[in-house]
From Swiss-Prot:
InterPro entries: CECR6/TMEM121, TMEM121
Task of the protein: May play a role in MAPK signaling.
Taxonomic lineage: Eukaryota, Metazoa, Chordata, Craniata, Vertebrata
Underlying gene: TMEM121
Name of the protein in question: Transmembrane protein 121
Signal peptide feature range: none
Family statement drawn from the similarity comment of this UniProt entry: Belongs to the TMEM121 family.
């Protein structure tokens, strides 16, 4: 498939978000080292950033080219690459904070958490680029999809909150095995779950139906809403961790109840969905090419009553 010309604004915005977060990570790494070691770390991160920029120069352009299409394949590649590099730098920052037990400066650690909580969910929303999906014409469908994207961003904040528990100062530390398990569990979730969400959007195509995107809600229900409740409960009860976020525990309980109601409603709708409506949906998909031709010729296309029923 030949991609259209890239959206320059989207390419610039993606590059700014990525390189801003990477620059701050590098600043933390360099600042945590002293003497001759600081020069060596500075050279290493500089070489790494140059290599990353070379790759980003091509991938960001490909992402900007597909932003107005129904595909998000290059967006998944860029997300995977970004999180892979970011979490490696974050791991060394976390280990440096852990080794320097005398430095309990709270502001720098809180600033690191704030930076991640803005850049990571922000990049996900930029890669989805909902406002650039011109093929989504109905306001109701776009707002439904926007609500689902908000849940993904909220889940990313939930994961980052658990990771931040490792470098933000607290009275009692966790065992080494627990720290490593928590960090890499969050690492895997950050790598995979947003890619699952992007792949669902990509697989739906131009006839996207947010109510049919059920893979991500199921995975997040198990891996985030349920598992993170147990993680926080164990940290709070067994390890007496005073920094456990009870607000996110409440958020996950509400999310479990909400998703349970959604799954029950979806199951009921599938059972009651008439067979003739399925046939009409297939017929509508087969005529999509003709509808596209009419729209390019300036003929306004009014949504049929059948499509309105199928969107509900």
């Amino acid at each position: 498939m030949v991609l259209p010309p890239p959206d320059k604004r989207h390419v610039c915005l993606t590059t700014i978000v990525i390189m801003t977060s990477m620059a701050f990570m590098d600043a933390y790494l360099v600042e945590q080292n002293q003497g001759p070691r600081k020069i060596g770390v500075c050279i290493i991160v500089l070489v790494g950033d140059i290599c990353f920029l070379i790759v980003l120069r091509y991938v960001a352009v490909w992402v900007g080219a597909e932003v107005k299409t129904a595909k998000r394949g290059y967006a998944m590649i860029l997300w995977f690459l970004y999180i892979f590099v970011l979490e490696i730098k974050l791991y060394f920052i976390f280990q440096n904070y852990k080794a320097d037990k005398k430095n309990l400066e709270t502001v720098a650690r809180k600033a690191l958490t704030l930076l991640l909580s803005i850049c990571v969910p922000g990049l996900y929303l930029v890669l989805v680029a909902l406002d650039s999906m011109e093929y989504i014409r109905t306001f109701r469908k776009k707002e439904d999809l926007r609500g689902r994207l908000f849940w993904v961003a909220l889940d990313l904040l939930d994961i980052l909150d658990i990771q931040a528990n490792l470098w933000e100062p607290h009275r009692t530390g966790l065992p080494i095995w627990a720290e490593g398990l928590m960090f890499f569990y969050c690492y895997i979730l950050l790598l995979i779950l947003p890619c699952v969400s992007l792949s669902e959007i990509s697989m739906q195509g131009e006839h996207i139906a947010p109510q049919k995107m059920m893979l991500y809600p199921v995975l997040s229900l198990v891996t985030i809403n349920i598992v993170t409740i147990f993680i926080r409960a164990i940290n709070m009860v067994l390890f007496q961790d005073s920094r456990v976020s009870t607000i996110f525990i409440g958020k996950n309980i509400i999310a479990i109840a909400t998703k349970a109601c959604t799954f029950l409603e979806y199951k009921r709708q599938v059972k009651e969905f008439p067979q003739n409506a399925i046939a009409l949906e297939l017929q509508q998909n087969s005529l999509s090419h003709n509808q596209t031709l009419h729209s390019t010729q300036g003929i306004p296309h009014e949504p049929s009553p059948t499509s309105e029923i199928l969107d509900t």
